[in-house]
Structure formats: structure tokens, C-alpha cells
């Protein structure tokens, strides 16, 4: 199963450097804290609509593969993050199987819990980079994060109803 927003997320083209954008846009695109928390600060109830979750092989993650260790399998999670039931963000998380050990096994058991609720409670979370991307007038970003030094890649597409616009 797929969703048009996830297809558009995979079509994002990334800027080589941070573009000169309005401060309000950059505030959203370069946010280093939890996007879930930011959405809740808008006075909204945040929920997750699961699109796809499970193990995939390298051929299913061509966009992410250059940014992650080469492994036989990856945990893929594709969701819509909704505010009061309205989709505001499409998210795609790719986790190398080697990351899924110790406390990070919890990444496979998030279910309808927003990823940010897990990530941003960890004292071992670090971020290698944020890249800004755009496709058909919509903005997105991707970040390589690390939990206990172990990588995962998070890509987010801000949907038209999002307060970013």
C-alpha cells in the first residue's frame, strides 16, 4: 500500500546548501526538536496514520541507501502525521537492521506513536545533518539521526494543510 504524499516525498529534490527562504519557513524546515511537539504547540491533537511498516531490502530504498550503511535489510516506516485528523506531514523512516538492537528495538514497536515521542526522549539522540528539499511547491527535509551512535534516516514532506505554508 502506498499514498500519493509518500510518492511526492520520494520525489523531493534536495538543495546543496540551505536556501535563502523566509525566516518562518526556515524555522520549520530547520527545526531540531520534535515536529510532533511543534504541531501540538499549534493547539492540535496529533495522531499517526500508518501507511506501511516492515522490513525491506536495498532495492526499495534507493534514495536513502547512499546515506546509510549497506546492509541486507532495513526497517521502513511510512506514515501521515495528522493534526486534528488532517494530514500535515508525510514521514518516511529507514532504519538499518544493525540499528535495531538494545533500546533501539523499540523503533519496530512504535505502532501509532509518533516517532518524535520516542526519539526526543532519548539522551543518546544526535543529528548529523538536515537537508531541505522541494517538489511541486511542497517543502520537505531529511535528517540522518543517531541513537547511541546508530544511524537512521528520517524524511518529512510538509503537506498543504501544514502551518509551514
Swiss-Prot record:
Q: Where does substrate bind?
A: 35, 77, 115, 156
Copy the pathway line from the protein's UniProt record. Cofactor biosynthesis; ubiquinone biosynthesis
What's any GO biological process attached to this entry? ubiquinone biosynthetic process
Please provide the record's keywords in A-Z order. Cytoplasm, Lyase, Pyruvate, Ubiquinone biosynthesis
Q: Does the keyword Cytoplasm apply?
A: yes
Q: List the catalytic activities from the record.
A: chorismate = 4-hydroxybenzoate + pyruvate
The catalytic activity of this protein is classed by the Enzyme Commission as 4.1.3.40
**Localization (cell):** Cytoplasm
Source domain of life: Bacteria
Carries keyword NADP? Answer: no
Which Pfam families does this chain map to? Chor_lyase
Any GO MF annotation of the entry: chorismate lyase activity
Name the PANTHER family on file.
CHORISMATE PYRUVATE-LYASE
The annotated subunit structure for this chain is: Monomer.
Q: What does this protein do?
A: Removes the pyruvyl group from chorismate, with concomitant aromatization of the ring, to provide 4-hydroxybenzoate (4HB) for the ubiquinone pathway.
**Identification of the protein by name:** Chorismate pyruvate-lyase
Amino acid at each position: 500500500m502506498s499514498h500519493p504524499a509518500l510518492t511526492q516525498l520520494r520525489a523531493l529534490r534536495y538543495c546543496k546548501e540551505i536556501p535563502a527562504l523566509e525566516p518562518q519557513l526556515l524555522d520549520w524546515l530547520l527545526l531540531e526538536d520534535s515536529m510532533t511537539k511543534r504541531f501540538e504547540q499549534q493547539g492540535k491533537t496529533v495522531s499517526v496514520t500508518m501507511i506501511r511498516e516492515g522490513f525491506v531490502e536495498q532495492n526499495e530504498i534507493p534514495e536513502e541507501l547512499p546515506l546509510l550503511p549497506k546492509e541486507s535489510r532495513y526497517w521502513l516506516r511510512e506514515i501521515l502525521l495528522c493534526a486534528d485528523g488532517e494530514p500535515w506531514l508525510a514521514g518516511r523512516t529507514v532504519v538499518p537492521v544493525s540499528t535495531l538492537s538494545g533500546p533501539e528495538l523499540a523503533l519496530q514497536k512504535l505502532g501509532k506513536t509518533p516517532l518524535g515521542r520516542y526519539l526526543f526522549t532519548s539522551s543518546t539522540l544526535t543529528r548529523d545533518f538536515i537537508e531541505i528539499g522541494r517538489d511541486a511547491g511542497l517543502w520537505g527535509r531529511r535528517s540522518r539521526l543517531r541513537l547511541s551512535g546508530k544511524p537512521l534516516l528520517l524524511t518529512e514532506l510538509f503537506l498543504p494543510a501544514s502551518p509551514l505554508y
